[in-house]
């Protein structure tokens, strides 16, 4: 593949949030990036998304205009009981001072649009990435660094990035074996409601009108036992996004279906919703009554992988470490992957150096992403760990006080110093 002088040719599989972030990070280093995605982007997924301080910092480092995200400041996490009681509150008004950026809530489509803009903008830093839709990968030759698509065509590159999500195709070729993403037993109803639809109901003013403004987590008691001895893990997460004009709702619970035969994402009815959350306080049930276009979404976790890298092919984001959404760090970890990859492959990096740099990328990213995934899992499954993220400043500092750009630059400096002294 032809490449610009002192530039690598990069092929990214997946034009989701992680793939676009990787494209931005690599184009900013002067590399020539092509993005391939199996979809046509005719039906983008509408849902809210958490952007904690470490994630917002990384977006700024990639040159994103955060004003375009239409974010809503998450000033407080409020834990509430399913009976209507108010429990612990975690004040987040000092996050900007503590971490350099605030925590915001955004609409996924707004975030995707901004990443797309920065990746493809001809006026941006470095050559603009190019996007190729309706290209589904069927095969990746790791030795030749090529991919083959369903239309029979093959593309080669100096570097291939598998950012193709939790159902990744590239993962199988990196690991040289199939990896099963097991059923978690956890599922969530999710939907969006226009904020002004709440106006006729004063009992819902607490969601977007009354302080403290921020996300609400409405849970059943932490240690009740059901008839089969399983903890009741039902939780409803509510927050505003898109400049406060929309409210995102995610209602998490144990899945009664066989997840191995059920589709990962299916439409659901209001009757389905009330059957699970029928005993929640009337103030919450009123919100459930406003639900429309409900989707039932399986939450699966990619098991710890033996490696993320094989020669000049690497994994990034959910393809490597998809996790539960309990810490709001799923996208953030993929974004950190992208920033690290771009930092470790500056302009002037040669194709012969890629394998060494990717090994360093894996060393830098794998433990942290797996730690966050494990913490996210325990917050959902271990009763005494529920709410730990809100209670533990040490844990929050470890997760949100981390600056991937700074850490990547340190690693690169050490690597270059070692190479120069050899």
Swiss-Prot record:
Positions contributing to FAD binding: 50, 108, 318
Principal location: membrane
Pfam families assigned: FAD_binding_3
Subcellular location: Membrane
A GO cellular component entry from the record: membrane
EC assignment: 1.-.-.-
Biotech exploitation of the protein: The availability of a complete eukaryotic luciferin biosynthesis pathway provides several applications in biomedicine and bioengineering.
Keywords: FAD, Flavoprotein, Membrane, Monooxygenase, Oxidoreductase, Transmembrane, Transmembrane helix
Subunit structure: Monomer.
Function: Hispidin-3-hydroxylase; part of the gene cluster that mediates the fungal bioluminescence cycle. Hydroxylates hispidin in order to produce the fungal luciferin 3-hydroxyhispidin. The fungal bioluminescence cycle begins with the hispidin synthetase that catalyzes the formation of hispidin which is further hydroxylated by the hispidin-3-hydroxylase, yielding the fungal luciferin 3-hydroxyhispidin. The luciferase then produces an endoperoxide as a high-energy intermediate with decomposition that yields oxyluciferin (also known as caffeoylpyruvate) and light emission.
Name used for this protein in its record: Hispidin-3-hydroxylase
């Amino acid at each position: 593949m032809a490449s610009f002088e002192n530039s690598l040719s990069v092929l990214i599989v997946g034009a989701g949030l992680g793939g676009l972030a990787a494209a931005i990070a690599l184009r900013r280093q002067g590399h020539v990036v092509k993005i391939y995605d199996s979809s046509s982007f005719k039906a983008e997924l509408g849902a809210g998304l958490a952007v904690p301080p470490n994630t917002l910092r990384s977006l700024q480092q990639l040159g994103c205009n955060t004003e375009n995200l239409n974010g809503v400041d998450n000033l407080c996490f409020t834990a509430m009981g399913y009976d209507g009681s108010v429990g612990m509150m975690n004040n987040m008004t000092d996050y900007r001072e503590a971490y350099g950026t605030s925590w915001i809530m955004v609409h996924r489509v707004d975030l995707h649009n901004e990443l797309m803009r920065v990746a493809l903008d001809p006026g941006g830093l470095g050559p603009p990435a190019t996007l190729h839709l309706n290209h589904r990968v069927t095969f990746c030759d790791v030795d030749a660094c090529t991919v083959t698509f369903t239309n029979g065509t093959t593309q080669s590159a100096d570097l291939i990035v598998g950012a193709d999500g939790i159902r990744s195709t590239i993962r199988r070729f990196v690991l040289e074996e199939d990896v099963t993403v097991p059923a978690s037993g956890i599922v969530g109803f999710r939907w969006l409601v226009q904020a002004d639809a709440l106006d006729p109901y004063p009992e819902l003013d607490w969601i977007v009108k009354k302080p403290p403004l921020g996300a609400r987590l409405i849970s059943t008691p932490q240690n009740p036992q059901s008839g089969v001895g399983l903890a009741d893990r039902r939780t409803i997460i509510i927050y505003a996004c898109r400049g406060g004009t929309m409210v995102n709702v995610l209602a998490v619970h144990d899945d009664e279906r066989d997840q191995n035969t059920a589709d990962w994402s299916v439409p659901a009815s209001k009757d389905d919703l009330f059957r699970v959350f029928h005993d929640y306080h009337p103030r919450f049930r009123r919100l459930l009554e406003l639900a429309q276009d409900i989707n039932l979404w399986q939450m699966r976790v990619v098991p710890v992988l033996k490696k993320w890298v094989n020669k000049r092919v690497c994994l990034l984001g959910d393809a490597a470490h998809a996790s539960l959404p309990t810490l709001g760090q799923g996208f953030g970890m993929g974004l950190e992957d992208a920033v690290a990859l771009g930092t470790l492959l500056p302009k002037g990096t040669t194709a012969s150096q890629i394998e060494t740099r990717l090994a360093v990328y894996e060393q830098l990213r794998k433990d942290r992403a797996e730690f966050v995934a494990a913490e996210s899992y325990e917050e959902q499954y271990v009763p005494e760990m529920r709410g730990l993220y809100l209670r533990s400043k040490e844990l929050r500092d470890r997760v949100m006080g981390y600056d991937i750009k700074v850490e990547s630059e340190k690693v690169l400096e050490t690597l270059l110093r070692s190479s120069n002294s050899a």
